[in-house]
Amino acid sequence: MKLRDIIDSPCGLRYVIDSLPLASGYSLRYLMDTEALTAQEDIAAAYSRMREHLSAAGDGNLVSMLHSILCSLKDISHTLSRIEAGNTVDDIELFEVKALILLGRRVSAVLEKASQASIAPHTGDLEDALKVLDPDGTEIASFYIYDSYSPELAALRADIRREADADCRTDLMDREQALEAGIREELCRTLRPSVPALRKLQEELARLDIDLAKAVQMLRMRLCIPEISTSGVTSYKGMYNPYVKEVVERAGGEFTPIDLSFGDGPVVIIGANMGGKTVVLKTAALCQWLFCFGMGIPAEEALIAPRERVFFISGDAQDMGAGLSSFAAEMKAIDGVVRASAEAQDGSRIAAMIDEPARSTNPIEGTALVEALVDILGQREVALLLTTHYNIPSSHCTRLRVRGMEDGKMNYRLCPAPEGDVPHEALNVAESLNISPEWTGKAKKLLEYE
């Protein structure tokens, strides 16, 4: 699974990625094509790199300087492939190769001067390639077929400058072009062995841009570096959703951070609409995916277990293109989790966050479907986090609920929900929205609240 495959998942992932202060568009494309990390050692290495970049990220002047250099990083993979295949490229493409080497040298020099050599790209293998493209040693970011490449070419150009006759000049210029073509061919032949090192440099520069952006984002947004869980349990202290937090604070409100733990048996969150259940689910999915790509986690503290597959099923899953209703599309999506867990050698390597499954069907069948789902995935040790309106027995899961209305304000923190504890928050929420007292009052009488 690549980042681009899940970027538009409705959990706030795009907001976090769009907030990365990347210098280069190529770096963003490189990041989008990155595969999710599933092995503990790979995830540990990713966060080790982030720690290495934190010192540089805290130096505003250094970050600005690197940003101004890395913004010119381009993807020249096509040019490198052409050279590797034995093709002769033009002057613009040769300039791109030279510019890449010079860019790498500039970045390395800046980092070494700032005592950050440990994160600098390696350009030592490309000294010979630079000499080929910069025979005069000017280190200027430009390229043409220099006189230095051929005494014959230099003499011919001098003749062209002196020649007054137009026809003679044309003949001389034709000879010049033929000589230049031969030199380009030889340059490409000479550069061919350096293509692997050039590719490596391009990727190192993109990774530097990405890792530095991750570290800067972590400091700016006060994210945390998670601990890696080896027990299968994932837990968060002070977890929040950056996108929702910004929206709430922009409206003058205050976002409530959440403490959450799951992975040791299914966890079911019950409660009314507007109770924050879906936000908890979305934030848990967001954190798991950020973890898969070695990014800062929006929480005070985080302990996260690596997963091979992550499922997030939320909202209206209606697939009009496939001719499916909301219920049918939702059932097919959830069935994908059930089948994946059946095929997996270790169900604990799967995480599933499912928002109010079977909510669009009748309560009797809906309760049966959800209870069966929790039982099946629980037996297979899937790390299941599920929200529902239905009253699911605690024998199948750990039940949590949103605290709800307290002193006229909504408390979104989670607390245990004992067996038979069905939260009655719908009318409280309705009253907080100034819904017609006639309506809510009659509903209370019907429920014998009064």
Question: Which residues does each PLM region occupy?
Answer:
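ATPase nucleotide-binding head domains, primarily ABC-like/P-loop NTPase cores
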Residues: 229-450
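Glycine- and acidic
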Residues: 58-59, 187-192, 267-271
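A general alpha-helix detector
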Residues: 49, 75, 79, 186-187, ...
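Charged, amphipathic alpha-helical linker segments immediately N-terminal to NTP-binding catalytic cores
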Residues: 200-245
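Charged/polar positions within long, soluble alpha-helices
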Residues: 55, 78-85, 106-116, 131, ...
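Extended, charged alpha-helical coiled-coil/arm scaffolds that mediate oligomerization and mechanical coupling
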Residues: 124-209
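Active-site phosphate-binding and catalytic loops of NTP-dependent enzymes
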Residues: 84, 213-223, 291-300
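Conserved amphipathic alpha-helical "coupling/scaffold" segments
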Residues: 1-149
